[in-house]
């Protein structure tokens, strides 16, 4: 995996975590 791909996937996982917190 390229470094950019890792950063993108990490960012997506962070956003999903925030969305889950807001939905609860």
Curated annotation (Swiss-Prot):
EC number: 1.15.1.1
Keywords: Antioxidant, Chloroplast, Copper, Metal-binding, Oxidoreductase, Plastid, Zinc
Catalytic activity, reaction form: 2 superoxide + 2 H(+) = H2O2 + O2
Keyword Protein biosynthesis tagged: no
UniProt-annotated location(s): Plastid, Chloroplast
CC cofactor: Cu cation; Zn(2+)
Keyword Oxidoreductase applies: yes
Cofactor annotation comment: Binds 1 copper ion per subunit. Binds 1 zinc ion per subunit.
GO CC annotations, alphabetized: chloroplast
A GO molecular-function descriptor: metal ion binding
Major site of localization recorded for this protein: plastid
Task performed by this protein: Destroys radicals which are normally produced within the cells and which are toxic to biological systems.
Subunit: Homodimer.
Entry's family note: Belongs to the Cu-Zn superoxide dismutase family.
Protein name per its UniProtKB record: Superoxide dismutase [Cu-Zn], chloroplastic
Organism: Picea abies
């Amino acid at each position: 995996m390229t470094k950019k791909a890792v950063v993108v996937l990490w960012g997506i996982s962070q956003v999903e975590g925030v969305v889950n917190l807001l939905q609860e």
